[in-house]
Structure formats: C-alpha cells, structure tokens
C-alpha cells in the first residue's frame, strides 16, 4: 500500500517510493521467495503443491509464474553460494566425500537417474558445501579442487588422487574408512586385525578428548603429536 498525500496548498501530490524489489518488476517480497525456497528444499514441498495451497486460500498463481519466481530467487543467491565456496576453501583444510542421490529425469516421466552430491567440509569453521554433479568422475570436483592448496582429506577413491598430488596439497586419509578394512580382515587374521582396531580406538579416544574440551586447532595439533603419533608409530 502506497499512501498519497496532497499539499494543503494544492501544489502537487506526495507518494512514498516503491521498496526495492528482489525480482525486477516482480511483486513477490523477499519473505515470500524465502518461504517458497524453504518449503521446497528444506521441507520437500514441490512448487506445484505450494501452488495448490495458495489456491485453497483463494490465491491463484500460474505455474509458470511461481516457477519463474523460484528460478530468479535462486539466481539472487548465487553471490552467497560463491562466498560459501570461497569460505569453505580458504582455511586450507578440506574433507571431501561423495554420495549418490536419485534425480528425476526431465526427459522421461517418472524415471530417475543416479546423480552425486559432492560434499566439502571445512573443519576449521564448520562450513559445509553440497555440490550436485551428474557423475562420480574425478572431473566433477575440478571447479572446487583444481586451485585448492592445503590439506585434503578423503577416502581411498581413486578420483581424488590427481588432486592429492598437486603442488601445495597434502593428501590425508580417513581413519573411519581405514577401520572398515581391518573389520573385514577379522575373519582372516583376527589377532592383527584386532590390534589395529584397538589402536584406532585409542586414536578415537584422543579425538573425543579434544572435542569435549573444545581445544583450539594448535592445541589439537600438539595433542596429536604427543598422544596420537606414538600410537600410529
């Protein structure tokens, strides 16, 4: 609502300026757009169901309109996404893993194909980046890892090797994944497998102590050198 005010003198009319719009020449407010995206991506409520809910309240919105709002709202979030990518990479320590996700195939009604979430975690400031890619091929991580320098922690998937060998990158393994192999070895060589599992359990206890006491990164490093390194050696 924009109120108009006329001067008592009769000299002209004053009207408030329109608020800045999120979408150029569009009517949805920032709160409406954030609701649409939250409902869809956090609460798993597709846009067509949101359209039906609006209709029950007597608000008719064309499918093309609400879909256009969603698309343009996502475009407005791109600077935030780029900032998240930068923040996630900037500390020089990344933990990376990839996992499957079923994706609806727009060319085949009702059909799905298998896509991948590549997940990047920065343990220093706890930022997490979910990056969808249609494949598990190593090239899927190129836009994130090609210019990354620092500590890169992954499982044993061969796709990470080319990034771990880059200059300025120290490739770290993962004890959780390594532990699985010793569990598998219990049936073949129980004594040595149990020794390895017991040793890894000691490492976990040290990490638990660091977490429970909220140790700073430098203090964690000193703790690992003092307590964890002898266990590994």
Protein language model annotation of sequence segments:
Residues 2-6, 11-233:
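Catalytic center-proximal scaffold of phosphoryl-transfer enzymes
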């Amino acid at each position: 609502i924009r109120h108009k005010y006329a001067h008592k003198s009769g000299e002209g009319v004053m009207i408030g300026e329109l608020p800045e719009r999120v979408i150029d020449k569009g009517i949805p407010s920032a709160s409406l757009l954030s609701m649409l995206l939250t409902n869809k991506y956090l609460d798993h409520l597709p846009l067509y169901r949101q359209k039906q809910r609006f209709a029950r309240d007597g608000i008719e919105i064309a499918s093309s309109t609400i879909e256009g709002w969603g698309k343009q709202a996502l475009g407005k979030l791109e600077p935030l996404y780029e900032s998240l990518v930068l923040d996630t990479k900037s500390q020089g320590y990344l933990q990376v893993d990839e996992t499957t996700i079923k994706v609806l195939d727009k060319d085949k009604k009702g059909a799905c194909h298998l896509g991948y979430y590549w997940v990047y975690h920065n343990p220093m400031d706890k930022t997490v980046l979910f990056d969808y890619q249609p494949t598990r091929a190593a090239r899927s991580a190129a836009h994130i890892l090609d210019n990354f320098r620092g500590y890169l922690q992954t499982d044993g998937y061969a796709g990470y090797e080319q990034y771990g060998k880059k200059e300025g990158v120290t490739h770290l393994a993962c004890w959780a994944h390594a532990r699985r192999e010793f569990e598998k070895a219990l049936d073949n060589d129980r004594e040595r497998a149990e020794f390895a599992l017991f040793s890894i359990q000691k490492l976990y206890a040290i990490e638990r102590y660091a977490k429970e006491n909220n140790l700073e990164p430098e203090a964690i490093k000193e703790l690992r050198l003092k307590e964890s390194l002898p266990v590994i050696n």
